[in-house]
A protein has these predicted regions:
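Membrane-proximal structural modules of membrane-associated proteins and complexes
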Residues: 1-105
Length: 105
């Protein structure tokens, strides 16, 4: 087998993937589907960068945080960001959290 350079796949604070939530996305089912999709896209992205890890790990109860945030801020556009919580090389676990940001209209 070929030896792979043990390069960094992601750095702490890197936004790996993001998505803008529109008004029609602001329901629990749509949010859950988008989060699952974002995590799948994140996994695909890190594999494209050369990661040998089969899954990404998440930290925190971000689904509740996102749902609560949206309920308190109706009729606003939001951006979900999948952010790396640590530097990770090819064979190291990828640890992420999903942040939600208000977008100015």
């Amino acid at each position: 087998p070929d030896l792979l350079e043990n390069k960094f796949i992601v750095r702490k604070g890197d936004v790996i993937k993001s998505y803008i939530l529109e008004k029609n996305d602001l329901n629990q089912k749509s949010i859950n589907l988008k989060i699952k999709s974002l995590l799948k896209e994140t996994s695909d992205e890190i594999k494209l960068k050369g990661s040998q890890v089969n899954e990404i790990n998440t930290r925190g109860n971000f689904i509740k945080k996102i749902t609560d945030f949206i309920q308190d801020n109706q009729n606003i556009k939001f951006k979900l960001e999948v952010v790396s919580l640590r530097d990770s090389k090819i064979v190291e676990p990828i640890l992420v959290e999903i942040n939600i940001l208000k977008l100015e209209i």
